[in-house]
């Protein structure tokens, strides 16, 4: 692997990051401290992803009032229609939002690199590594999420094929501009074309969803939920005097999940709107949320109360003392993050948009801290920043992707959103996550500094990682297709085959990481 030299300290390592006396500590101790802090930042990303996901659900519930006149009776018909399209929600909100840690990290790295002729290495390395993490470990988790024996398949195969095409084309395009068009150089036009292709992805996915002629694949759509928001596996009871805590009904068997999941179903300010909370008028056309009169300030205050509560209702219901202690300990560890994120306004305000934007701002702040910590780890250990980027950073910043896909795989009746989040996130990583930072750097260089393109310092290593990714991803997609043909679904099925598929996906990820690391280290 990479050459690690604890004895040598680069000049930049003389600056402290956490406290004044840290530069006097041995490099090994400093590396350990920075690694712990980095892991804690990833826990923060995991925690904020829960708030992000809930705010996104609130945005998706937003509907508009449509008034029509019955041509036969001249009666006025009032009904509510969803504002967001199902597919656009997957491509835009879900994929873009869960990829925001990688995007913000790459953008911050580019801004720090302004005025340089060579691009920063953290952004591209993280995004390619994140693509591998999204495709392999997240698929490995999702395939075992459905309950034993149950199956979940993609209902709209045409949309998935469109998203898969743009996902693979994104990395083919990246290889073309790195090795074929202008080898190891990024021009302003290449960066601009990269960003514009995200708009083409949105348009093509929407066209496929609407089955526009000539530009869509003529495949029938299977059954899928009318509402994008995942349905609950079990209802959640509330009383009229809301206290901020929803109790999970007995028999759900989610003790472990609720301890370690970033998005607990019990409290922490996330209030479910189950199907029975949505009432239908006698005409069957008007929806009413029974919580619409809840005062937002009391809900916001409840977020701080929940953040200060170490023992949740789930922990109190656990029969095992050990699990209860683990739950309390975990809540104690994440208490600072919970208290900080309690300042995010409730998602009930402005249909969740304020909470959505605030969540992205917090994610950007954590991503900036991650870049600084990574610089110090690379400095005191001698490990290549690129190796750190596509391993530790890629896994850590992809955690919101994992949480979102896991929740979708558990709660939705189809596999569309769980798998679409993976393929769309990989597309967003290139078109936005790499395109925008490179566009910022190339525009600055062309307009203000050198009048020259942007050079890629480690283009050979990046290109090799892309080739390995292509080879391993082909093996992944082939297995998903075989599961659909033989077992009838991409996710779930017999537990033995589900776990075998999961292990296979993890092996593919290990192969990618090992080969890419050996290439960067000069071993191969």
Curated annotation (Swiss-Prot):
The keyword Transferase does not apply. It is a multi-pass membrane protein. It holds the Pfam family Na_Ca_ex. Keywords: Ion transport, Membrane, Transmembrane, Transmembrane helix, Transport, Vacuole. One of its GO terms (biological process) is metal ion transport. Vacuolar transporter that exchanges protons with Mg(2+), Zn(2+) and Fe(2+) ions. May control the partitioning of Mg(2+) and Zn(2+) between plant organs. Its main location: membrane. It is found in: Vacuole membrane. The keyword Transcription regulation does not apply. This is Magnesium/proton exchanger 2. It comes from Oryza sativa subsp. japonica. Belongs to the Ca(2+):cation antiporter (CaCA) (TC 2.A.19) family. MHX subfamily. The chain crosses the membrane at residues 28-48, 88-108, 125-145, 157-177, 185-205, 325-345, 349-369, 377-397, 430-450, 462-482, 496-516. One of its GO terms (cellular component) is vacuolar membrane.
């Amino acid at each position: 692997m990479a050459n690690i030299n604890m004895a040598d300290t680069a000049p930049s390592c003389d600056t402290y990051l956490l406290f004044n006396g840290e530069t006097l500590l041995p490099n090994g101790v400093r590396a350990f401290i920075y690694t712990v802090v980095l892991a804690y930042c990833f826990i923060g990303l995991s925690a904020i992803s829960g708030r992000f996901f809930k705010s996104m659900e609130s945005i998706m519930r937003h509907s508009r009032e449509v008034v029509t006149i019955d041509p036969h009776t001249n009666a006025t018909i009032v009904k509510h229609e969803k504002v967001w399209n199902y597919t656009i929600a997957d491509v835009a909100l879900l994929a873009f939002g869960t990829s925001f840690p990688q995007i913000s990290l790459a953008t911050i790295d580019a801004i720090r690199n302004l005025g340089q002729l060579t691009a920063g290495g953290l952004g591209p390395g993280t995004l390619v590594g994140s693509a591998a993490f999204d495709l392999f470990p997240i698929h490995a988790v999702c395939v075992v999420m459905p309950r034993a024996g149950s199956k979940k398949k993609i209902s709209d195969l045409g949309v998935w094929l469109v998203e898969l095409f743009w996902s693979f084309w994104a990395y083919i395009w990246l290889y073309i501009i790195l090795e074929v068009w202008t080898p190891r150089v990024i021009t302003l036009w290449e960066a601009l074309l990269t960003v514009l292709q995200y708009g083409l992805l949105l348009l093509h996915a929407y066209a496929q969803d609407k089955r526009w002629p000539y530009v869509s694949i003529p495949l029938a759509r299977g059954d899928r939920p009318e509402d994008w928001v995942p349905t609950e596996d079990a209802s959640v009871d509330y009383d009229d005097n809301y206290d901020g805590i929803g109790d999970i009904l007995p028999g759900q068997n989610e003790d472990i999940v609720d301890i370690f999941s970033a998005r607990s179903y019990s409290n922490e300010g996330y209030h479910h709107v189950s199907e029975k909370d949505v009432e239908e008028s006698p005409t069957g056309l008007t929806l009413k949320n029974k919580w619409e009169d809840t005062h937002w300030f009391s809900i916001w205050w409840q977020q701080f109360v929940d953040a200060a509560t170490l023992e949740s209702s789930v922990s109190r219901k656990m029969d095992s003392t050990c699990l209860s202690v683990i739950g309390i300990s975990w809540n104690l560890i994440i208490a600072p993050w919970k208290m900080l994120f309690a300042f995010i306004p409730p998602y009930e305000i402005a249909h969740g948009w304020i909470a959505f934007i605030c969540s992205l701002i917090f994610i950007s702040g954590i991503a900036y801290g991650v870049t600084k910590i990574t610089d110090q780890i690379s400095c005191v250990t001698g490990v290549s920043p690129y190796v750190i980027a596509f391993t530790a950073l890629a896994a850590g910043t992809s955690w919101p992707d994992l949480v979102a896909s896991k929740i979708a795989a558990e709660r939705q009746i189809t596999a569309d959103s769980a798998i679409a989040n993976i393929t769309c996130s990989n597309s967003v990583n290139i078109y936005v996550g790499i395109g925008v930072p490179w566009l910022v750097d190339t525009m600055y260089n062309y307009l203000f500094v050198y009048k020259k393109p942007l050079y890629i310092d480690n283009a050979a290593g990046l290109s090799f990682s892309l080739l390995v990714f292509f080879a391993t991803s082909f093996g992944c997609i082939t297995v998903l297709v075989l599961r659909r043909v033989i077992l009838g679904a991409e996710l779930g099925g017999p537990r033995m085959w589900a776990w075998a598929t999961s292990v296979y996906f993890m092996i593919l990820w290990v192969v990618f990481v090992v080969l890419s690391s050996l290439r960067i280290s000069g071993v191969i």
